Amino acid sequence: MTTVKKSALMNAEEREDQEDEMLTDETQLVTFKVDKEEYGVHIMQVQEIIRLAAITRVPRAPSFVEGIMDLRGKVLPVVDLRKRFLLPAKEHSENSRVVVVNIDDMTLGLIVDAISEVMRLPNSAIEGPPRIIAGIDSRFLKGIGRLDKRLLILLDLDKIFSAEEVFGMNQVAGGME
């Protein structure tokens, strides 16, 4: 199958998933933990979840960029969400994972403490973002999801990084291939 056909097929599947969500009034999320909080991102932005592997540090990279890693022959910039959210540092554990996401036509990895689950959340259970949550900039948030006694912080991946930061991470990855 050609790349064009694959791309068209993926776009058709993406539209189908979005239409399904509109019809079912649910949002499908990948949820994970960073520090003591549980976060969620839209499943359509997640490419895959991998184990934390060797990371190569890059000189003069932004402080929240942990470095780069090899993902099947491609250079993957890796961001530590703890650093991005100005949370206390913690050693990575066997539960630590890298959530590989697509943001603005760029693929990057997000280090998280643990994966919780893939879930469907009713849109009626999602509230707008509060002004501040434990030091996290409210611009990073799409909202708060309530499910039973759980609160999920729903991240807006398109706003977690400025255009300049995305450009810088692209340069880090592009310059290393």
Regions found by a protein language model. Give the residues of each.
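An acidic, low-aromatic, low-complexity terminal/linker signal
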Residues: 1-177
